[in-house]
Amino acid sequence: MTAPRQSTSATPDVAAAHDKILIVDFGSQVTQLIARRVREEGVYSEIVPFQKAEQAFTAMQPKAVILSGGPASVLEAGAPSAPMSIFTAGVPVLGICYGEQTMAQQLGGMVEGGHHREFGRAAIEITDDCALFEGVWKKGEQHDVWMSHGDRVTKLPEGFRGVARAAGSPIAIIADDTRKFYAMQFHPEVVHTPDGAKLIRNFVRKVAGLKGDWTMRAFREEAIEKIRAQVGQGRVICGLSGGVDSAVAAVLIHEAIGDQLTCVFVDHGLLRMAEAETVVSLFRDHYNIPLVHVDASKTFLGELAGVTDPELKRKTIGRLFIDVFDEEAKKIGGADFLAQGTLYPDVIESVSFTGGPSVTIKSHHNVGGLPARMKMKLVEPLRELFKDEVRALGRELGLPDVFVGRHPFPGPGLAIRCPGEITPEKLDILRQADAIYIEEIRRAGLYDTIWQAFAVLLPVKTVGVMGDGRTYEFVVGLRAVTSTDGMTADFYPFDMRFLGETATRIINEVKGVNRVVYDVTSKPPGTIEWE
């Protein structure tokens, strides 16, 4: 029996003791990247829609504010704006794209509809030095940035000066060094602006003077105290999916409350080669976490027989998972809390930019509907973290890197990597092909370079020749992409020798396959997964 240390104090907010930056969201598709860039500097950041910005600013008391981009025009009636209290509070403010335009207009400058719209890569010329550029850019230099705007600032507010210009933006960057207000027409948060992260670092560290103490070690200690304060002597059930998020959540909660936690691992028969055994061994044998392992593969595969529509596959798997999990929870009995691996992007995506509910947590793909049905309170220890931070926390908790660093795996598992009807035979073929592919990627030293790689079993057969005989067997598709966030992705440019050797192994070693193809589709227009 593992007994937790008793909490001596309650920690209502894991980030309360740290410097914080508030990010006001005006609807940009890449606002999450701003938060990630700030977090990379060891400073906690939080995103709120502009409608809630004043309330959040008062409650959060941030040391700096960043105004995001957005699709609106400040020239339209009723256009989104930042609370004026932000500009009078004495904190540094950084405006990005729409954030620059609303800052300029609200403080007395002028914005006009652009006759020269800029979308994509653009060159800017640095016309003067400022604190944002220290150690990065110098007067007279030209640099590539990523633009996405129609309107542009044409008259500076009082106290500002222009420090950069571009073909479509005569005032591409503005600076008020006295008030520490800075703004730029381009997007520094995206990788297409090569020096963008350095500019954000300068704003965070040099302009705002923040110390950067938001670390996973600090988060671990504070989250443990928060879990103990919330749970007390209650019991917690955590559904393990075999993925990184639920695994890290379970280990963190177990460190906080010991055997008050019971994990339920539902094996739906759609996992990768030896994955179920790995999960059981890690949690039951290595961490000694109470674990209920349910082999429900026959139930899932029986219900999925004949189902070909990908959305119906997902819904069927989700419904069955809830049924099985609910049944096991009743057997355990006495649980007061349900633990979920909700991440910060799930929280952000459920906040309506245009209005509506303030915050609605998006349910985890496997346990949606469980809290309402089971009448349990939620424990979500990772809800302030991005995926890369969860991996870092996992390493801090001692989870093996081979587990923490695994590529993303969808909740419905191999069901959506097997287009068409799912059968045990097809799943066996797919598991073997996928295992060989990943083994070859690891052997080539490419696993950590690639964001995600997997095999797909296509619902077609082709004619082949093996020895002196004709074959009519399945086609395996190989997929590998590079990405920073999964929002966009490029196919990985393997050399032909690697692809040839991998294809030869799969065809020779996996019975039922006589052809292998490689997917060279980027996202967009394609998605990373096939279904």
Swiss-Prot record:
GO terms for molecular function: ATP binding; GMP synthase activity. Residues 214-406 form the GMPS ATP-PPase domain. ATP binds at S241, G242, G243, V244, D245, S246, A247. It is an enzyme of class 6 (ligase). The active site is at C97 (nucleophile), H187, E189. Residues 20-213 form the Glutamine amidotransferase type-1 domain. Pathway: Purine metabolism; GMP biosynthesis; GMP from XMP (L-Gln route): step 1/1. Its EC number is 6.3.5.2. Keywords: ATP-binding, Glutamine amidotransferase, GMP biosynthesis, Ligase, Nucleotide-binding, Purine biosynthesis. It holds the Pfam family NAD_synthase. Disulfide bonds: none annotated. InterPro entries: Class_I_gatase-like, GATASE, GMP_synth_C, GMP_synth_GATase, GMP_synthase, GMPS_ATP_PPase_dom, NAD/GMP_synthase, Rossmann-like_a/b/a_fold. Homodimer. This is GMP synthase [glutamine-hydrolyzing]. It comes from Afipia carboxidovorans (strain ATCC 49405 / DSM 1227 / KCTC 32145 / OM5) (Oligotropha carboxidovorans). The gene is guaA.
